[in-house]
């Protein structure tokens, strides 16, 4: 029946069970008194029909306004966070008719202080029904999560997960596993004595990206398990500063000619990729993340 009647109504269930509509309503919502016999009949039909309450219709009828907040890193066209922002916009558009309003709060993904600043204004909003949190900065996100817990406001995480908090859901990949697989992929192309370059984008404040930290942990764990005997070199690069980046990378590669592999744990793989291409370092294998335009064009 569940395939034939996906939109079964309460009145249909009442007719099949031989009870009143009010009895079905009380069983579905666990309210009021219902005889054991009638409850069994109704629940049997609910299970057989795979009945799910029509939450959208209920929302339309209730007149209640729902207000959700979404913390969203600022981005340039084609960057990783653009797709997530567009997804939020799409969800907001599709649920607007059901009394749902979504407000986006933007911050600099390379500066945890800007995230803390929007958090300070977040609770100026009235009647918050839920928050979507971009989990770039672990310490800041944990503080926000615990404040939301104290206020009994539900929240979900996007991008990377943080274990031990009370998020309703997490949307993203397993960061640690992604780093582990990246190392496995890179080492399949290198010898155990090859040197590896790990690049990171400089962040303002004291926090690196939670996603990047987890990926790096998984990456290094694989190397340890495989008995990696080469050296790991690390370099800090700047977003949108090609001259600085090329100068730093020139220094690294001149001083460490045995570097044969490189990895960056966020969506800015194109920075290293463009350098390697420009310098003709075709022997260096590069691993990165996220199918944004600048990366796929390499």
What spans do the regions from the language model cover?
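Flexible loop/hinge segments that line or gate small-molecule binding clefts
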Residues: 137-177, 292-297
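Hydrophobic alpha-helical segments within soluble ligand-binding/sensing domains
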Residues: 170-196, 245-246, 294-298
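Proline-centered loop/turn at the N-terminus of a beta-strand
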Residues: 130, 152-156, 169, 195, ...
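N-terminal helix-turn-helix DNA-binding module of bacterial transcription factors
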Residues: 1-62
């Amino acid at each position: 029946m569940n395939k034939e009647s996906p939109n079964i109504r309460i009145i249909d269930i009442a007719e099949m069970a031989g009870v009143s509509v009010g009895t079905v309503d009380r069983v579905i919502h666990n309210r009021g008194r219902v005889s054991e016999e009638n409850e069994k009949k109704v629940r049997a039909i609910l299970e057989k029909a795979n009945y799910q309450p029509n939450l959208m219709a209920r929302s339309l009828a209730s007149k209640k306004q729902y207000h959700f907040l979404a913390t969203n890193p600022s981005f340039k066209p084609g960057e990783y966070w653009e797709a997530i922002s567009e997804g939020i916009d799409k969800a907001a558009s599709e649920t607007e008719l059901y009394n749902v309003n979504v407000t986006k709060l933007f911050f600099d993904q390379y500066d945890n202080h800007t995230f803390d600043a929007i958090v300070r204004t977040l609770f100026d909003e009235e009647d918050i029904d839920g928050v979507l949190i971009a989990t770039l900065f672990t310490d800041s996100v944990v503080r926000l999560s615990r404040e939301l817990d104290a206020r009994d406001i539900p929240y979900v995480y996007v991008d990377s997960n943080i274990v031990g908090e009370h998020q309703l859901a997490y949307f993203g990949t397993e960061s640690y596993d992604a780093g582990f697989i990246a190392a496995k992929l890179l080492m399949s192309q290198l010898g155990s004595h090859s040197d590896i370059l790990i690049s990171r984008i400089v962040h303002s404040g004291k926090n690196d990206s939670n996603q990047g930290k987890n990926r790096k942990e998984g990456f290094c764990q694989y190397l340890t398990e495989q008995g990696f005997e080469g050296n790991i070199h690390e370099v800090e690069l700047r977003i949108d500063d090609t001259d600085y980046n090329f100068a730093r990378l020139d220094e690294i590669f001149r001083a460490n000619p045995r570097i044969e592999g490189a990895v960056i744990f966020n969506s800015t793989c194109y920075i290293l990729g463009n350098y390697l291409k420009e310098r003709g370092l075709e022997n260096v294998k590069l691993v990165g993340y996220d199918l944004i335009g600048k990366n796929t064009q390499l």
